[in-house]
């Protein structure tokens, strides 16, 4: 029996089957990515209590900005490499990969230095409670040191996906997640290193996955290329072209994360009890939205490859397939969360000793958002199509509108309805972003039929 090829050919065949097949490893990879980020919270919270849980939660709001830059660089890289792949341009694929790896490591080194130096001032700016600020700063400094590993892995995973291979990143994430869990248990539980131990566990797991993914990618793209296509190790022209994609994605991801920081500062004054419940529920929410983000990334790669191959008529069907998949996932998530939300909360908190306000906050967060994930799925699929088409300014402006509205909504209502204003602002922002994107896209298509799919 022949093994299925690792790379999914997206320019031929049934779009629904292609999207479903390609999205599945991406969904599981994203879930493991979230597990990777979440095990610190679970193990620290269960072993060291609510204050340690809150410290990791506050730190995570800051690390999301760092993750955003790495993710944005990966997204921008993925779109361009997918276009090169669709056009069959191996020389540009190789040049693009080596160029972005060099550039991303330089950016990562800068972010690492800034993270180590400015951890404490930033946490003070966010009004972090004094009883957790030292632990949060320790976690943040150690996490910052791992930026080169994070960038290296994110860019390489995006390249694999752009080439139609979503399985390799998934396998690497499974390995990395298991390593992270093992070192978390060893450092936090065995050596009693607390919050710092969780940060070191993440550092080591990221390093291993980054090195292995580098070896696999260079072996696949460079050593096993029998055609020996000529390429430049570093190209200013390719970097400029890639930057036009990556810069918008980095800005968009950073805007989202900075917005989360601002929103986080609305939660912090409620105290460590509410913050612990919010942190636990936000981790569960992060798992819930991962499949929709994966579907958006699948649509982005699918769209870019078909655009590069000149098969614009296939793009509409890919978008519709992603929306259908997201709808099914949203229904399942609603049922699971409503049935098991208290048990999920128990993964992060000791419900027998946690305060009533912490539990009430977490339960309220999960219950309210369970009704709204279908909106997230539709919006993510549409944004993925926009990225694949190269409509990056429209995508960016929609994200800015989303976050701006979320911030206004939160601060306008937090004194009226309490901390629930923070999470209720999310679906409101998704709706506004989708409406803006649809209207903007139709206007753009009337001016210039850039993709031939205006009637979506």
Which role fits each region the language model picked out?
Residues 21-40, 142, 153, 176, ...:
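Transmembrane helical elements of multi-pass membrane transporters/channels
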